[in-house]
Amino acid sequence: MYDELPPELWVKIVDYSGEIALLLTNTSFFELVSLINIKTDIIEYIVDNNLLDVLKYFVVLKNLKHNLIDGKIITLKSLNENLVKNCEKGNIEIIKYLLDIGADIEGKDNCAVLTASHHGHIEVVKYLVCKGANFRANNDKAVRWASDKGHLDVVKYLVSQGSDIRSENDCSICWASGNGHLEMVKYLVSQGVNIRTNDDWAIRLASENGHLEVVKYLVSQGADIRSQDDHAIKWASGNGHLEMVKYLVSQSSNIIAEDNYAVRWASENGHLEVIKYLVSQGSNITSNYYTIIAASKNGHIDIVKYLVSQGVNIRDCDSSAVQIASENGHLEVVKYLVSQGIDFREHDDLTFDMALRKGHVEIVKYLVGQGVDFRVYDDYPVRMASHCGRLGVVKYFVSQGADVRAEDDYAVRMSAEKGHIEVVKFLVDNGANIRADNDYAVRLASENGHIKIVEYLVSMGAVLNKKN
């Protein structure tokens, strides 16, 4: 019934629905294609849906030199792009037909065989190689990509065909190790790959990513876990791989290398169990104040408390820990540090200043509750909050009595200059004089291209003319 509908009606149906699959129910499919304005690529749709019979019909049309195949529907670019896409998916029959109708097996810099290798489609790889694909292109990139993803059968096949697994300075074993492909690593070693290339990059990557069995194997083969100033334990600690850290310590890694970098990085990234273990093994968390600052910066309250319990003196770091916690919005850390006696008013209330600049209104409220003067320096806090566009902070200060007109209406001028339209509107609603200093607010907004603010200020009575 459906294929009896006239082509003109099908054009309207497909245009309206956007369902390109409807074309395939009509015998006038190829005549319709030229009439329908659909963004979907016809070949791409057929390939994505594995419509092999339709593709076979395309081959027939190609042999008949049909104008659609030679012209607007199939182009070399679309064939090559869809060849690569199907090498990714592993649709070997589609791949064969795409090659039959003119796809370039070495197009896009031999991307077809590279993609098939990368995704582990061994039968596709074999077929492409059989058809003449240059599997050694880009300095044997195909075998390196297969190693990276752990496709052992692909690697073995490519090696059997002559690929050099040692290309690019033994990069294959580094990638395989970094991704935890133990059997691949063992195979590569059996083929003579140098596990110590690039200053033991393989074991460093495996440690960094927590692949314990790979690390153990590499150590058994002579890799140096202490290369690059004990890079392995520093990265394992920073990434929270506790069992890896324990193993590396058992193999004599230096946990205090680079001024206790391992425990500092674990503190920054929130790995409490790693920190506890490193401390039990002799890491010095009191030699400098970086650990407490790093933990405070990222809001790791449990680590901050643990470090204090282990003797870290929060006053040794000046007020840096509470300042950075305030800047990054970590209220609980701020409260805890204040409860432990840190001087949060140091450096002219910098802790407070950082919170208001970043818009952390709850921290601002807390610090005001702790005695910080929010009207200091002729209402500098509300002026700075306006300058930074922190509407919530501005509203809080105004609710507490801050003067929005301080310093000749600095707040509305600076918020206009920076493009903070909601702050501008709030300040105007609360009595700011938009015409202060010869309409400075609208002039600044105009100079900086904030057209919506200019329009708003003019609507509220500001004057913008040639003179100003």
Swiss-Prot record:
Q: Where are the ANK repeats?
A: 38-68, 78-107, 109-137, 138-167, 169-197, 198-227, 229-257, 258-287, 289-316, 317-346, 348-376, 378-406, 407-436, 438-466
Alphabetically ordered keywords of this record: ANK repeat, Repeat
InterPro entries cross-referenced by the UniProt entry: Ankyrin_rpt, Ankyrin_rpt-contain_sf
Protein name in the entry: Putative ankyrin repeat protein R873
What phylogenetic lineage does the species belong to? Viruses, Varidnaviria, Bamfordvirae, Nucleocytoviricota, Megaviricetes
